[in-house]
Amino acid sequence: MRLQNKVIATLIAEGVEDLEYYVPLMRLQEEGAQVLTAGLDMKPVHGKNGLVITPDATIEALKADELFALILPGGWAPDKLRRYDAVKNLVKEMDAAGKVIGIICHGGSIAISAGIVRQGERVTGSTGIKDDLVNAGGVWTDEPAFREGNHVWARVVADIPAFCRELVEALAE
């Protein structure tokens, strides 16, 4: 188990894409990681397709120096999460420390609001945020999943297998 005892947080809010949350969580657990689900508060969250998720922690309680990596799943949740300073600050701190951040689908909108999309960085996600990612300085890349520095990017639900492969490889280095 390549990720034994590594603590990884996944950020959620109402409307998170169920599969983009749950499949990477299970895959990382298979590798031995402890995956924390963090919400804006401790109330259960309903996924976009009906999954009910109870957070393990609040985002505000997370500390970048205690986390190995961060996952930003898509759905409608990123549009809510990107508005909160606690979210943006955590993402900025993780990025500044060079820690891996997995970004799939609309999760890229959090990366934009946190200011971690680097000028000229290859990016991908839902085509619904393509213009936003490009306007933030990214170079749109229509590939299922890839690693760019400490960021692991993926487009959509159909790309979850490729996302999980790239994510595990980046985290196992």
Locate the predicted segments by residue.
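Catalytic nucleophile serine of serine hydrolases
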Residues: 105
